[in-house]
A protein has these predicted regions:
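Short, charged, solvent-exposed linker or helix-capping segments at domain edges/interfaces
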Residues: 91-92, 104
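Short, charged/polar, Gly/Pro-enriched secondary-structure boundary elements
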Residues: 85-91
Length: 132
């Protein structure tokens, strides 16, 4: 768990009952994918990577729950900490060098790896990947 810099904290709030339930299940069954949602879209036209990244950074900047991290250890009651920015939530992988026949399998494997990479609620519960 990364120590938070107070200058990066926008707000600290109590958990809602729904968030308490999510944290309960997260701690009780750490290998569960109960709250994991993965969406995969195929875009047939060119994607301007910098614009894609800028757009997602904007989405995260105006949706504080996407910048939320949980803290429950060493505090009286679990807390939700809203960060000013969410670092490293974007991942870009260029798969264009893969043979066309292998590309779908390669991307499917990347999606499987992403699904297997469990979220640490202390670090955030949101990420975006772009496979070109």
């Amino acid at each position: 768990m990364k120590k938070l810099d107070a200058n990066q904290v926008s707000d600290i709030i109590s958990l809602s009952p729904m968030q308490e339930g999510m944290l309960f299940h997260y701690l009780k069954e750490p290998d569960s994918s109960l709250y994991f949602e993965q969406i995969s879209l195929h875009v047939s036209s060119a994607v301007h990577i910098a614009a894609f990244q800028q757009a997602w950074r904007h989405v995260v900047s105006v949706n504080e729950m996407l910048r939320a991290v949980f803290r429950w250890e060493g505090v009286k009651a679990p807390l939700l900490i809203i960060l000013k920015e969410l670092p490293d939530f974007l991942r870009y992988v260029d798969v264009s060098a893969q043979m066309t026949a292998d590309r779908d399998t390669f991307v499917a494997n990347l999606l499987d790896e992403d699904r297997a990479n469990k979220f640490d609620l202390r670090e955030g519960a949101f990420r975006v990947s772009l496979y070109k």
